[in-house]
């Protein structure tokens, strides 16, 4: 594998051809001698030399040949075929969006001035951006977060525009008990608490990831609560500073959402956000490694996990409450099919297909956001389904 990788690296440099061909070939051949013992056969240097020289001679004719879709779009063949079948009119656009450079998108904290205040701080710092959605700002150029005014004090957080739809769809209200079932790294939890004076239970099965939730909530200036705390919970206030009487803050738990018996106190939740584990097929531009370590068979495994989590969490929702099912996937086996099967089995469940994100002109009726990168839209791929529980 190391020798093949070295050969591919040499060919990639010959295609780019920013340096003289003899230099590229010579340095690649020399690199063979730097490989670990046993990684290359005795004639490897000569083999690399010969193949690169031939590639350099025949490069024009080789590159003129039409590439298979797998090579042209740099996606596994099964992935290309699947997307092409699902969206025959948009498949190339979807694949190219997944290969685009992901922008740095920010979410303005509504409790610290919101989108307009964040925009003013960016303008003052000479940072180019465009407003998107109710709380979003997309930077013209990505920057380290320590150079973004307002990040350290929690007035802005990094979050994709598509991911910001979760809290807006769930629509938290003052005084409610809300469960964020798979909460790490905590962006959606913080957004819920920025929107309303509510009490959120934020869970993650991994203690290290639960710690990340805590860190992000502290930066966003959200009170951290505990189910057995001796400290006073955060007091919610109006814009004028008057107390509302509601509890405002987050309980962060390292717990398994699929095993409620181990952590649930028996009190039903008004709203539940289930951002379920998935293939991550909608966020490839941020995690390109997903393309090559994800296997076709993984989708069925994720679907089973998603269905199990829905079954386990539904009893925790009060009658009249709402559950938002979300994944960062573009495959219907993890989205529409999971929800349809669950709703057909659950007599007290209604899928609210008509719900839209406020201000989103062309929100997809089925809730499947596809990756897009253009003037009007700049977001990853997500699936959202809002489920209501009959009284």
Each PLM stretch: what is its role?
Residues 1-391:
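S-adenosylmethionine
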């Amino acid at each position: 594998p190391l020798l093949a990788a070295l050969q591919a690296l040499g060919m990639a440099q010959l295609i780019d051809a920013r340096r003289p061909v003899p230099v590229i070939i010579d340095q690649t051949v020399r690199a063979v001698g730097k490989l670990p013992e046993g990684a290359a056969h005795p004639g490897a240097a000569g083999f690399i030399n010969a193949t690169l020289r031939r590639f350099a001679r025949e490069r024009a004719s080789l590159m003129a040949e039409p590439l298979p879709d797998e090579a042209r779009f740099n996606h596994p063949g099964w992935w290309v075929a699947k997307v092409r079948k699902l969206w025959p009119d948009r498949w190339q656009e979807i694949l190219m969006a997944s290969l685009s450079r992901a922008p740095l998108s920010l979410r303005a904290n509504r409790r610290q001035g919101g989108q307009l205040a964040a925009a003013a701080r960016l303008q003052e710092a000479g940072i180019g951006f465009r407003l998107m959605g109710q709380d979003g700002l997309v930077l013209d150029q990505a920057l380290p977060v320590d150079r973004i005014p307002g990040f350290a004090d929690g007035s802005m957080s990094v979050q994709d525009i598509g991911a910001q739809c979760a809290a807006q769809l769930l629509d938290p209200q003052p005084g409610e008990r809300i469960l964020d079932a798979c909460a790490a790294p905590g962006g959606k939890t913080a957004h819920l608490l920025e929107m309303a004076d509510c009490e959120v239970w934020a869970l993650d099965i991994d203690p290290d990831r639960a710690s990340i939730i805590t860190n992000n909530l502290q930066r966003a200036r959200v009170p951290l609560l505990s189910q057995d705390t001796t400290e006073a919970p955060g007091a919610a206030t109006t814009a004028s500073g008057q107390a509302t009487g509601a509890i405002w803050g987050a309980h962060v738990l390292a717990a398994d959402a699929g095993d409620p018996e181990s952590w649930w106190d028996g009190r039903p939740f008004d709203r539940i956000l289930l951002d379920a584990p998935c293939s991550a097929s909608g966020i490839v531009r941020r995690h390109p490694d997903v393309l090559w370590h994800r296997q076709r068979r993984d989708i069925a495994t994720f679907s089973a996990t998603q269905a199990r989590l829905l079954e386990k969490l539904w009893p925790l929702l009060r009658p009249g409450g709402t559950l938002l099912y979300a994944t960062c996937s573009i495959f219907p086996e993890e989205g529409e099919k999971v929800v349809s099967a669950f709703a057909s089995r659950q007599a007290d469940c209604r899928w609210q297909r008509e719900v839209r994100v406020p201000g989103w002109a062309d929100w997809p009726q089925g809730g499947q956001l596809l990756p897009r990168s253009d003037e009007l839209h700049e977001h990853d791929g997500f699936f959202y389904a809002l489920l209501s529980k009959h009284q």
